[in-house]
């Protein structure tokens, strides 16, 4: 049984349509979607939204407490990657995924970049954040530091891919222009 005090509000309003119709949005109470979160240990911090209008909720580096290590730190070696535990399980609602994104301060000040970042509805384990360090300097994080942000994204899995010999019968103004095709200025 989940302790109701450990539930948090994902947003102030419905992201996908703004409605509060219970038949259409059965997982919502009023306008706030409730998402269950489980702390795996007492030091785990719940995700927090710094401002009510922020899309993302901050995630924290929260390893399980160890008596033999009073202050836990983790280093990401130059050009290396490390997995950072959050100490949380988050139940992703039906029709959504949880996307783990860079925090601007972590990526711009420390150069740490989030790796594989999709948490599917079917995943039931602890949320880990994969941080990559493309710099030439070791980066160190302490337990309790902000490491990334989590964003709930509406998705559809009601898709069937159908193989075709040609998919674009009409020309578009972009065509097959890829990265950098519009120039720098």
Located regions from the model:
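DUTPase catalytic domain/fold
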Residues: 2-10, 14-18, 26-185
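Short functional micro-motifs and their immediate structural scaffolds
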Residues: 22
């Amino acid at each position: 049984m989940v302790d109701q005090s450990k539930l948090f509000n994902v947003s102030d309003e419905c992201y996908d349509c703004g409605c509060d119709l219970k038949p259409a949005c059965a997982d919502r109470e009023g306008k706030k979607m409730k998402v269950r979160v489980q702390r795996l240990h007492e030091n785990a911090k719940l995700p927090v939204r710094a401002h009510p209008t922020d899309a993302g909720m901050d995630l924290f580096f929260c390893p399980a407490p160890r008596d033999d290590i009073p202050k836990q730190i983790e280093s990401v070696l130059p050009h290396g990657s490390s997995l950072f535990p959050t100490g949380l399980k988050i139940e992703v609602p039906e029709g959504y995924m949880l996307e783990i994104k860079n925090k601007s301060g972590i990526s711009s000040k420390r150069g740490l970049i989030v790796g594989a970042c999709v948490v599917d509805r079917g995943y039931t384990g602890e949320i880990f954040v994969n941080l990559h360090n493309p710099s030439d300097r070791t980066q160190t994080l302490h337990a309790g530091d902000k490491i990334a942000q989590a964003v709930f994204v509406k998705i559809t899995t009601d898709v069937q891919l159908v193989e075709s010999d040609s998919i674009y019968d009409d020309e578009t103004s972009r065509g097959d222009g890829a990265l950098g095709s519009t120039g720098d200025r």
